[in-house]
Amino acid sequence: MTFSGHTARKRFGQHWLINERVLDRIVEAAELKNGDRVLEVGPGRGALTDRLLASAAAAIHAVELDRDLVAGLQQNFGRHPKFSLREGDVLSVPLELADGEPADKVVANIPYNITGPLLDRLIGRLDRPVDPPYQRLVLLVQHEVAQRIRARPGHSNFSALSVRMQLLGRCSHVCPVPPRCFQPPPKVQSEVICIDPFPPELRPSAALARGVERLLKMAFLSRRKMLRNTLAPVCSPDHLQSLAEEAGISLQQRPQDVAPDAWVALAKGLNQLDSAA
């Protein structure tokens, strides 16, 4: 079966990746090895699925919402011993493979209208991370989102999302993906990124994560203001000054200038202050 008669549906945010070089880069970035079990989100017409099945991976489990595409995927790949398919919304259906065990890695062409919720589902939140984490996620996302995820302190794109994602895993750029690489072409630039989630022992504890979230919400709500002003409610000025210095933070800085580890250090100091009170 071919998909030539199936047109992209706007309500599903469908833009099919057709550039072979980018498809190859995605598979290369996943670094698939013998035994790897892969979750593919949004297989579409199967261009990436075909490459994943040809890789060393042991199993490819695809999740597709569009019923018409499900029929074509099942006809094209249903007899392949490494392939399984689940029809449904990736935000709500179980993501485990047929044996009930989770995948090792994720490859996803994320519809731009569900990027935030899907990141929560695949990686989790700072205070509620996915556990156990996937070994690696290779994600095709809107360029602006990719910039915010991997931005470094001091950059205009550095945000609360940057801090959260970089405390949950190692985020890196794979390749740019211009609109011409899709059918139909989207109106925005895209990018492939790679995220290697940290194991639990390298992530902030639940208590620290809650403290960091509290600080991020306060600080980035008024990102143009200095921390001396935005963080004033957390404790007395003298205590805030002392804790900031211990964390390597200047209260004259703005939130986008503070590194993720420094936010953790400040949250730790505040937690200790609260415990001693």
Feature locations, PLM:
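Catalytic cores of RNA-modifying enzymes
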Residues: 1-217, 242-245, 256, 265-277
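Short, well-ordered alpha-helical segments
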Residues: 239
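Active-site-proximal catalytic alpha-helix in oxidoreductases
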Residues: 221
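Short helix-coil junctions and helix-kink-helix linkers
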Residues: 232-233
